[in-house]
């Protein structure tokens, strides 16, 4: 990260000191900078109470997004913040009004503020369980939009479901569709017992590849944080680009690169970052980037030197990180979105994220619903052909 401090630019305003809220009651429409100034404790206590916590709904992710997204998007973002009678924050909903192509027709949509930048998964509205969400619906009704789209929702997202129920009570129409498959592992407490769940061929391959590397090379796994954070990040990006031969990859978009540089710094400060390389004879051959949140280890991205493909260095490093998660007492290992073949080799379990589209009542909403229904029908007919 080229010597970048923990927070620069917009993120410099994301301090850990919270804004005094004791005099506020009800729903307040805030800028993203003011909402982030409430501090990580306010955001993350809601994340922790929202079923399985999602790192992508956290203060850290939103702060990194705000320092990476187009300036106009950040300026246009509104965060609906519900304050209880004692001034404590009961709910947070960061949204952005933008023009999108809905079924090829340009419309004004309300979406998650963070959009799909950086591929966030398992999202949900942030609220305490006892907070009624009708007040947020009233605030949403005051904003000008034609469709409200909540993408990348966690399966059975509790608060999004409650929000949709409140919207339906006002006559708004809610439609759902599956989105992304996210493979995951439910971890036990023993590495060998996990290996026993794999095919015998898979087990033998894993053991043989690691044994050969240790026999033929000085093999080590290096973890990066603190003073070595820049070094580790640069090695990850370099190996990721080599894997794609300079023609693609997750970090080709400068905004995505900047977002993760900011997020990685915050994760490292919280001791939640897993940034590692597998080194052979003193040189990095593969890299792994993920993070912990609650009882889950999330795998985000990796890279490898193609010269070591025959030795399966990526396979060996992934096995080491899964084993570390098991031995560290974590309960779940989440591969995040995408049914890549290498993910299916580790697990058959997957969660499906969801997209919810909400239509207002009236002729405009009816027309957009009809447009949506026709597009869905065409898709089903094409699938049968």
Across the structure, where does each feature detected by a protein language model lie?
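Hydrophobic, well-ordered secondary-structure elements that form the walls
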Residues: 282, 314, 321, 325, ...
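A conserved beta-strand-loop-helix scaffold within acyl/acetyltransferase catalytic domains
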Residues: 26-112, 152-182, 186-310
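A short, internal acetyl-CoA/4′-phosphopantetheine-binding micro-motif in the GNAT/acyltransferase core
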Residues: 117-131, 302-310
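Hydrophobic pocket-lining residues that define ligand/cofactor binding sites across diverse proteins
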Residues: 140, 267, 325
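Conserved GNAT acetyl-CoA-binding A-motif
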Residues: 145-153, 325-337
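Structural motif
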Residues: 127-130, 150-155
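Conserved acetyl-CoA-binding loop-helix of GNAT-fold acetyltransferases
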Residues: 129-140, 310-322
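Active-site/acyl-donor-binding loops of N-acyltransferases
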Residues: 2-19, 23-25, 29, 97, ...
């Amino acid at each position: 990260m080229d010597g970048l401090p923990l927070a620069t630019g917009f993120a410099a305003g994301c301090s850990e000191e919270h804004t005094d809220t004791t005099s506020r009651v009800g729903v307040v429409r805030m800028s993203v900078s003011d909402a982030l100034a409430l501090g990580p404790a306010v955001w993350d206590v809601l994340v922790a109470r929202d079923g399985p916590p999602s790192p992508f709904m956290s203060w850290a992710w939103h702060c990194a997004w705000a320092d990476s997204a187009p300036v106009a998007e950040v300026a246009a973002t509104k965060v609906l913040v519900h304050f209880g009678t004692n001034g404590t924050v009961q709910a947070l909903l960061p949204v952005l009004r933008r023009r999108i192509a809905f079924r090829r027709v340009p419309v004004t949509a309300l979406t998650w503020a963070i959009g799909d930048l950086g591929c966030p998964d398992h999202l949900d509205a942030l609220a305490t369980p006892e907070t009624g969400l009708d007040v947020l619906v009233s605030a949403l009704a005051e904003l000008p939009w034609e469709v409200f789209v909540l993408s990348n929702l966690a399966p059975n997202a509790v608060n999004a479901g409650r929000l949709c129920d409140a919207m339906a009570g006002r006559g708004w129409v809610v439609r759902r569709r599956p989105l992304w498959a996210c493979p995951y592992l439910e971890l036990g407490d023993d590495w060998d017992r996990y290996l026993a769940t794999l095919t015998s061929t898979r087990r033998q391959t894993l053991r043989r590849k690691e044994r050969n590397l240790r026999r033929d090379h000085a093999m080590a796994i290096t973890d990066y944080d603190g003073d070595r954070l820049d070094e580790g990040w640069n090695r990850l990006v370099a190996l990721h680009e080599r894997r794609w031969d300079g023609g693609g990859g997750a970090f080709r978009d400068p905004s995505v690169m900047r977002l993760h540089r900011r997020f990685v710094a915050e994760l490292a400060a919280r001791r939640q970052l897993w940034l590692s390389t597998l080194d052979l004879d003193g040189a990095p051959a593969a890299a792994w980037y993920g993070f912990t949140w609650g009882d889950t280890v999330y795998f985000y991205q990796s890279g490898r030197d193609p010269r070591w493909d025959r030795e399966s260095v990526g396979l060996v490093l992934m096995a080491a990180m899964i084993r570390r998660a098991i031995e560290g007492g974590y309960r779940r290992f989440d591969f995040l979105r995408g049914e890549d073949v290498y993910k299916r080799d580790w697990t058959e379990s997957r969660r499906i994220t969801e997209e919810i589209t909400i239509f207002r009542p009236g002729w405009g909403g009816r027309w957009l619903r009809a447009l949506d229904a026709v597009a869905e029908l065409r898709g089903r007919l094409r699938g049968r052909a």
